[in-house]
Swiss-Prot record:
Its cofactor is Fe(2+). The lineage of its organism: Eukaryota, Metazoa, Chordata, Craniata, Vertebrata. This is Lysine-specific demethylase 2B. Zn(2+) binds at residues 623, 626, 649, 652, 657, 660, 680, 683. Residues 388-463, 536-562, 729-958 are annotated as: Disordered. It comes from Xenopus laevis. The gene is kdm2b. It is found in: Nucleus, Nucleolus; Nucleus; Chromosome.
Length: 1259
């Protein structure tokens, strides 16, 4: 008798745990799961003839229908037309599902015969699904593959009405949904109830017993392929009570619930049909043919009492949290908040949530009208009378914002002033809502333009007087929702963090329900959703080249330090130069600030080595005058291209087409170093100048001071040098010093501003200097060109005819023999020099002083934006290569020349072969100082400047070379045959040799590698070196590391070695296929290399007896890495695939175990031996409800854990898959408790003691 009682009790216990899915499929379970009825008979029986399903067409399924009928009747649609459903093509199969969700995606697969779930990858299930029916040993069914946030999500679209009523879309804060990254339904990574879209894949014969969908959710169900048979039981009080008793009876497999319920209907769904199951309906499903179904679950506002009742049934029947609606009560709180916010315009969300989800307390003031982001609209979409109304309202600025806000939080005011304030606020809110409705394109199809409001009696007193009517279903449901949330104890209220004051929310909801108690149901059925998120303002995306706003007065002058508001644009990368193409150096102060390099991330700057040398205008830039973008690609000819290309002034920052300029008093000076940059004619004519730094590099430019090679200035000097060499061959030797200019000076001396250096000049970058001295002959030739360039530049500064005559005389003397090359070289040098440095007090140049032919020649030399960018990147790359090669070959150290005063800069020097020029000290205007003193001795500013000694050279400094990871090209594959001495190939092919090598030890393989080159490569095949053991190796040398990398092992043992962090980092960066790593006995400093984003996805990790590894270090080891590379957005732990973890001898606590539960969902073998802080509570934590380790744990080693007692064995009973428990040498665990554990588990799983306190499952 006693045995019978125990047996019955145990059977019931077994059945209860069917929700937990932790048991083995033992013989006892198989016996319990045998059905007591014939499923084939139930499919063909005609007894289930209830008439509950309503047949509809998609066009009739509208939001107005939902308001009228409340979604309480099952609906069947023969086609998807009119529903708004989007489905894949007809040839879509489960193999395509695998491709879109990932072949490694783990899914819960239900064994139909035992009603137990097992884990399979999608690849495994698809292989089973495609197996012929006769070859399937078991029936497997996938009913819980949620595919939101996968590629499959874009292929399947829900019915339109479902989107309109779903609480997830309309109640849950939007910014939380946008933060969801994890595609699986791991509760720890879930940001919202992720139950919107499911894929159900069933083979013929699958059966799911009677159930109610979790949380009382309603279900939409589209049969894409195959068919289904449903048994439906209506959710009457009697049926729900019967269903609850049936669940608790333990006889589900013996009783077909449809035979005992009040009414049951069997209905067969065919391919292409869509089914809607309301909340609370009890149903069972049979699959007559292999099927593929798409569906989803929703909670809505029209059947809330039934949803709450189903949730209570789940509480009483103790359904596992894994199979329940996630964040159920949190969702209920957000539902109340959204209704209160919509009806009273008062939000109970915290400020951060209001800002993120774009809900703000819309105060009836002018400021709120202009600042509310979700009320932004285009004025063009508004009617004329609305604009007039807006104008009347805006005439008087609102001064009562503070008063109205206080009125909002207080009781109603009965005074005359308060009434006037309410009236003004009402008008303003009506205007806002009207304008926002006109601009809300997404709501045009279902939202009426005359959107009613809630009355003034609501908690927010500044609302319009029109009433939003609620349906009777919504009123009844919201009332039940308030009562339910009030009745919950404090520890079960589950108030989300986004709700600021839950009690105030409940009070406001009660007030709203009182106000709407007498709502007219006919007026409420309007087809308009009451709660709806405001439309987000669309971000301005540049499609083609959008037009900017045209300035009303383009002739308005701006100061030199002020940018034009409509035309200023930040330049963007050219993406072609060497700087743009390289990676971060990781060593500059910008890199050290970046979060991925461990910094705080405050500077928000790119790496110094990646700062573009030729940034271009963004594609959104437009002309200030005409509002058009650049059109140089549409025309032919250099002159026409220049007139229609955008040019940005380096002084006033105006972006303009040269052809749009009306003033032609003076010509603009083009900056050859920066695309689309010049000094516009307006600034040039007015004599304005900007900072030398801006003129050197143009607006919005940052330069990397330690960039290898220099800018095009150096390249341009090289080209000038080559031209100069050709010129000098045609020239005769002439005097080095020309005649002196007469002593009479002009009244105005503009050269003072030239010679006197500005304070900003200190920011101008100095180029590299080398020890090689300049060639005197080449230097003499350079003086001739600089001499002419200076004179041409100064000609514009002299205003009197005498001054011009003197300058022309000197110029004619220099150019005694005219030459075409020099004629072209001089204007080029002049343009480049003026683009770098212009005279602060230079007067306007006269149009007649320069022939038109020279202007044409100069304009022909201006290239378009794209051509210049290509030229810049090409020449820079060549320069960098030349610089690096010369440094590598000659090993010259740069010598830094530092001027002793502000008047000096480094001069230019060139090498003897004429291939390279570098800067020595020169004058600010680009003229060599010696030549300047010889030409214009009277222009010297002060004796102090004249008597300056030559600059001294500082000691040589080592040049910092670039740090790049050099990836060698892939080596050729190993030969397939062994070449012999006579040139023939050996008869045995490579694969035969590989089979022989597989029998050799590693020591023998190393001997074979010495035979010949071919064997050397064959013996390094990674198939022969899956495991490498360096256990207790005294020293790890670089040669050993290279050998490991060459062999690419899957298992590496580095235990009890002195490997350093740098060595381990170098290894794991180059072993992507590494799966098993043993670092026991190493130091934490070395093990910390695993915290990098480059760590491979290990399966086994052994960190036993690691010195210094505690809870804080475990947190760093298990947390997601912080040094993600650009574009790497995976925020999961790099140890998420760990199945075996050995932590023996570590000083860790329960804090580390919580991290393991969170970040190691596949953990199967855990070694905590010799961990003195592990207690019974630790085991309780590992086996708690909802933890992944409760399902996955197979082996547990707790030997020598002195704080573990007999109580831990009761916790191990929760683990359905546990196979080995090692409690040896645990002082507080008795042998009798182990024997009792074996006896209690014998009904489910047979355990035995192979040694004392070593419990092992008997196979």
């Amino acid at each position: 008798m006693e045995a019978k009682k125990d047996s019955a009790r145990r059977l019931r216990s077994i059945d209860r745990t069917r929700y937990a899915e932790h048991e083995d499929l033992s013989d006892v379970e198989d016996m319990v799961s045998i059905r007591g009825f014939s499923l084939e008979q139930k499919v063909s029986c005609n007894a289930y003839r209830g008439n509950f399903v309503r047949y509809m067409e998609g066009k009739d399924f509208t939001y107005e229908y939902v308001q009228r009928e409340a979604l309480q009747t099952p609906l069947l649609f023969s086609t998807k037309e009119g529903l708004g459903i989007k489905m894949p093509e007809q040839d879509f199969t489960v193999r395509d599902v695998k491709l879109l969700v990932g072949s490694r995606r783990v899914v819960d697969v239900m064994d139909v015969n035992t009603q137990k779930s097992i884990d399979m990858s999608m690849s495994q299930f698809v292989r089973y699904y495609e197996t012929p029916e006769m070859e399937r040993e078991k029936l497997y069914n996938v009913i819980s593959l949620e595919f939101s946030h996968t590629k499959l999500e874009r292929v399947v679209k829900r019915p339109t009405v479902v989107d309109a009523v779903d609480w997830v879309d309309n109640m849950w804060p939007r910014h939380l949904k946008e933060q969801q990254k994890e595609s699986t339904n791991v509760i720890a990574e879930m940001k919202y109830p992720k139950v919107k879209k499911y894929c159900l894949m069933s083979v013929k014969g699958c059966y799911t017993d009677f159930h109610i969908d979790f949380g009382g959710t309603s279900v939409w169900y589209h049969v894409f392929r195959g068919g289904k048979v449903f048994w439906l039981i209506p959710p009457t009080g009697h049926n729900l009570q019967l269903y609850e008793e049936w669940l608790l009876s333990g006889k589900q497999t013996d009783i077909f619930l449809g035979d005992r319920s009040e009414g049951c209907q069997r209905i067969e769904l065919k391919q292409g049909q869509t089914f809607f199951i309301p909340s609370g309906w009890i149903h069972a499903v049979y699959t007559p043919a292999d099927s593929l179904v798409f569906g989803g679950n929703i909670l809505h506002s029209f059947n809330i009492p039934m949803q709450l009742r189903v949730f209570e049934i789940e509480d009483r029947t103790r359904v596992n949290a894994k199979f329940r609606y996630p964040f159920y009560y949190e969702m209920c709180w957000y539902v109340l908040e959204r209704y209160v916010c919509t009806l009273t315009k008062r939000s109970h969300l915290i400020k951060e949530y209001q800002r993120e989800s774009m809900i703000t307390d819309r105060k009836p003031s002018l400021d709120s009208h202009s600042s509310d982001s979700w009320l932004e609209m285009e004025e063009e979409s508004c009617d004329i009378h609305i604009k007039e109304e807006k104008g009347n309202l805006v005439e008087k600025p609102s001064k009562q914002s503070g008063d109205e806000s206080s009125t909002t939080n207080s009781t109603h005011s009965n005074g005359k002033d308060a009434a006037e304030k309410k009236q003004k606020a009402t008008l303003m809110q009506q205007l806002k809502r009207t304008l926002s409705n006109d601009s809300d394109e997404s709501s045009k199809s279902i939202v009426h333009s005359d959107f009613p409001k809630t009355p003034t009696g609501s908690p927010a007193t500044d609302m319009p007087c029109k009433l939003t009517h609620l349906t009777e279903f919504e009123l009844k449901g919201l009332k039940a929702l308030v009562e339910k949330l009030e009745s919950l104890p404090e520890n079960k209220k589950c108030v989300p963090e986004g709700i600021e004051d839950p009690q105030a929310l409940l009070e406001d909801m009660k007030t709203v329900l009182k106000e709407h108690a007498d709502d007219d149901n006919n007026l409420a059925i309007s087809g308009v959703p009451v709660v709806m998120w405001p439309k987000k303002p669309s971000k301005n995306r540049a499609v083609g080249r959008p037009k900017g706003k045209i300035a009303s007065s383009p002739a308005v002058k701006l100061s030199a330090n002020r940018t034009s508001a409509g035309a200023r644009r930040r330049r963007t990368r050219c993406r072609k130069c060497e700087a743009c193409l390289r990676t971060e150096c990781g060593e500059c102060h910008f890199c050290k600030d970046m979060k991925k390099f461990g910094g705080p991330g405050r500077m928000k700057q790119s790496c110094i080595m990646r700062q573009c040398i030729a940034p271009v205008l963004p594609h959104t830039a437009v002309c200030l005058v005409c509002g058009e973008a650049g059109k140089e690609d549409c025309v032919e000819g250099q002159e026409a291209k220049f007139n229609v290309m955008l040019m940005e002034c380096s002084i006033c920052n105006e972006i303009i087409h040269p052809g749009c300029l009306k003033t032609k008093e003076s010509d603009g000076v083009v900056n050859d170093e920066l695309p689309n940059c010049w000094e516009c004619p307006k600034c040039n004519h007015a004599g304005k100048t900007g900072k030398v730094y801006k003129q050197k590099r143009g607006p919005g430019f940052k330069y990397a001071s330690n960039l290898p090679g220099s800018l095009l200035k150096e390249q341009k000097v090289n080209r000038d040098n080559k031209e100069l060499t050709e010129i000098v061959k045609k020239k005769v030797e002439r005097e080095e010093t020309p005649k002196q200019i007469p002593e009479e000076q002009p009244k105005k001396k503009p050269t003072e501003g030239i010679i006197k250096k500005k304070p900003e000049d200190g920011h101008v970058r100095k180029k590299r200097k080398f020890e090689k001295p300049p060639d005197p002959s080449v230097r003499k030739r350079l003086k001739l060109v600089k001499e002419e360039k200076l004179l041409r530049k100064k000609r514009r500064s002299w205003k009197t005819p005498d001054e011009r005559a003197m300058m022309a005389k000197t110029l004619r003397r220099i150019k005694q023999e005219p030459d075409d090359d020099l004629t072209e070289a001089a204007p080029k040098a002049k343009e480049s020099d003026q683009s770098r440095s212009s005279s602060p007090t230079a007067g306007p140049s006269t149009e007649g002083s320069e022939p038109k032919e020279k202007k044409k020649i100069r304009r022909k030399r201006r290239v378009s934006n794209k051509e210049l960018s290509k030229e810049l990147s090409k020449e820079l790359n060549q320069e960098i290569q030349k610089t690096e090669s010369s440094l590598a070959s000659e090993n010259h150290h740069p010598i830094k020349s530092e001027p002793e005063s502000d008047n000096e800069e480094s001069k230019k020097c060139i090498s003897t072969n004429g291939e390279r020029m570098h800067n020595f000290s020169k004058g600010l205007n680009g003229t060599p100082k010696e030549l300047r003193h010889e030409l214009f001795p009277s222009l010297k500013t002060t004796p102090r400047a004249n008597n300056r000694p030559p600059p001294s050279l500082s000691p040589p400094k080592c040049m910092q070379m670039e740090r790049h990871v050099i990836r060698p090209p892939p080596i050729s594959p190993p030969p397939d045959s062994l070449p012999l001495a006579n040139g023939a190939a050996h008869v045995m092919q490579r694969e035969v040799w590989m089979a022989i090598f597989s029998y050799l030890s590693h020591r023998d393989l190393c001997i074979c590698m010495r035979i010949c080159r071919t064997w050397n490569r064959w013996c390094c095949d990674k198939r022969l070196w899956t495991q490498i053991d360096l256990n207790r190796c005294k020293s790890i040398t670089p040669l050993m590391l290279s050998g490991i990398i060459r062999r690419q092992p899957a298992s590496l043992d580095l235990s009890w070695t002195n490997i350093s962090k740098k060595q381990l980092s170098w290894l794991i960066n180059r072993l992507p296929a590494l799966r098993d790593l043993n670092l026991s006995g190493c130091s934490w400093i070395a093990v910390s290399a695993l915290c990098s984003s480059c760590c491979p996805l290990l399966r086994t990790l052994n960190v036993q007896w690691v010195e210094g590894l505690k809870d804080a270090q475990m947190r760093d080891l298990l947390s997601p890495p912080t040094d993600n590379r650009p574009g790497q957005i995976d925020n999961r732990s790099k140890l998420r695939n760990i199945t075996e973890l050995r932590l023996a001898g570590l000083d860790i606590t329960d804090a580390s175990l919580r991290l393991m539960i969170r970040h190691m969902p596949l953990l199967a073998k855990l070694d905590l031996s010799y961990c003195n802080h592990v207690t019974d509570q630790s085991i309780n934590l590992l086996t708690a409800v909802g933890t992944s380790t409760r399902d996955t744990l197979l082996e547990m080693n707790l030997s020598d854990c002195n704080n573990v007692t007999d109580q831990c064995l009761t916790f191990f009973k929760r683990c359905g898959n546990i196979c080995l428990i090692d409690l040896r040498f645990c002082k507080q665990v008795s042998k009798e408790s182990c024997e009792q554990f074996i006896a209690e588990m014998s009904v489910i799983v047979q355990f035995g003691q192979t040694e004392e306190k070593l419990l092992q499952k008997v196979s």
